[in-house]
Each structure stands twice: as C-alpha cells, then as structure tokens.
C-alpha cells in the first residue's frame, strides 16, 4: 500500500482571521475567500491546506467543537536564519501572539514560534548551515 499526506485540515473559528494569518505568514492564498465555509489552498510543493469553519465542521459532525490545547504544530521552512527573524517580526508587528522568540537550537536550526488566531503553534525555521 502506498500512502501520501494529501491534506492538512485546519478548523477556523473565524475564516477571515485565520486566512489573514497564513497570508501574513507568506502563503499566497487568494483574497475574497474570507467568508467561505471551506477553502482549499494547494501548496506548490506539498499537501493541500484545507481550511474549514467551525460551523461547517458542525454540519459534518454535529457535536464538533474546537479542541482545547495543542495537538499538533505546523512547521514552515524559510531560506535563512535572517528570514526566520524577519518573518517572526512581521507576524508580531501584525498583532499575532508570540509563542517563543527565534533562537538557535542545538539540532542545527534557528526557529521561532507564533500562534495563529485559533491558538495553534506555527513554527518558522531555517537550517543554520546550508542543507536541503
């Protein structure tokens, strides 16, 4: 059996705020979708990011509620440690909450963490040395 990660599903309490965060992060999600119940963004070289409102999730599963706590994190790689700092600063300046300031980790990456509008931790990282 072959298996491939196809879609990362993200439930949004407020679609406009959630899409705004990921646009600020750098994903070119088209404008004009902030009031949709479901938005699929096909990343250029990875899985689809499927955004679904909490109301739409309740239509599929009537008892659905956004969970408390962190059950996963999203990790976005940029090209350099400076880009980690720049993107982190941009997100904080746009009013998003910091989870941890950028730092160099012993495993060879610079990373910073912010929270999206629904409290999910989003990691921004780059390798400290040149590698893919």
Regions found by a protein language model. Give the residues of each.
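Vicinal oxygen chelate
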Residues: 1-7, 27-115, 126-132
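Conserved active-site tyrosine of GNAT-family acetyltransferases
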Residues: 18-23, 91, 116-119
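N-terminal functional modules and adjacent low-complexity/disordered segments of proteins
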Residues: 6, 14, 20-22
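A generic structural signal for alpha-helix starts
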Residues: 13-16, 82
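Conserved beta-strand-loop-alpha-helix junction that forms the acyl-donor binding cleft
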Residues: 12-14, 106-107
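Short, conserved beta-strand/loop elements in beta-sheet-dominated catalytic cores
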Residues: 120-124
